[in-house]
Amino acid sequence: MAEVINGILINEAETKNIMTKSSLPVGGYSVNPYVGCTHACKYCYASFMKRFTGHKEEWGTFLDVKHWPEIKNPKKYAGQRVVIGSVTDGYNPQEEQFGNTRKLLEQLIGSDADILICTKSDLVVRDIDLLKKLGRVTVSWSINTLDENFKNDMDSASSIERRISAMKQVYEAGIRTVCFVSPVFPGITDFEAIFEQVKDQCDLFWLENLNLRGGFKKTIMDYIAGKYPDLGPLYDEIYNKHNRSYFEALEVKAAEMAKKYDCPFVDNEMLYGRVPQGHPVIVDYFYHEEIRGTENTGKRNR
């Protein structure tokens, strides 16, 4: 029975299997405890899901709470990459009420899977007890600005301050963490400033360029024209004329930053492991849609 809670249309959805074979290059499984995402990010690539789910509502205004049969044999996924939150955020605000992600984590205990949780929330701190039991687990927070006003223009998720605080708590609990600088907005995102804030509390520092396609391209281009008119020509050059020189220059800057802070610089870091504090692995995912398989090509600064 559909109901509206705090302005969000909530439905329930039955699914035969919560574990979906992934089409991503890294393989494994994608697991999404919800359909939709109420963070309502203006640049969200996952909004394409409406084509398959039949939702007519605006992206960010609905959420389907999935129900699935209990995972009876978690060891089936031993050694597999399991990505939680590829087209939703398992820690959207409604998770506090429905608890789907916590239930999922409980069912995966003993799986020995390589679990990656992608989020923009600090609610994940609630589940540190389970994360410790899971073993090989990584938690990634998307942070592409330190400017809360810009963040608020782009999404309704947890503040940047709360995300960074959550990252610190999870890191100090002995769990591998990622700062995912995504998407990098040309002329707006200062990834070195972000790095300086988080370098002592993350194992990996991922960089990904802003991709504009589909319906949200116009949304972002109009936003830039209205809020950052001086950047209009740059965005036109990158997103209409497909000039790559800006992000190519950022790759050079990222490599220089890696040398400055004595950090590895790679272009596809997926293996599980921890690193010395203050020296996270910097991962270049610019134009990742053209990458690169599952193996690291070995592009390093040392």
Model-derived segments and spans:
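Conserved Radical SAM active-site core
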Residues: 1-138, 146-150, 160-161, 172
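Active-site beta-loop-alpha junctions enriched in small/polar residues
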Residues: 87-89, 120-122, 142-146, 182-184, ...
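Conserved strand-turn element in the central/C-terminal portion of the radical SAM core barrel
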Residues: 156, 168-189, 240-244
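Surface-exposed amphipathic alpha-helices with a cationic face
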Residues: 109, 132, 165-174, 255-259
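Glycine-enriched alpha-helix->loop->beta-strand junction motifs that scaffold or abut catalytic
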Residues: 133-139, 199-204
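Generic structural signal for well-ordered alpha-helices
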Residues: 102-105, 128, 163-167, 191-195, ...
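Auxiliary Fe-S-binding modules of radical SAM enzymes
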Residues: 2-14, 192-302
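Hydrophobic faces of well-ordered beta-strands that scaffold small-molecule active sites
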Residues: 29, 82, 115, 139-141, ...
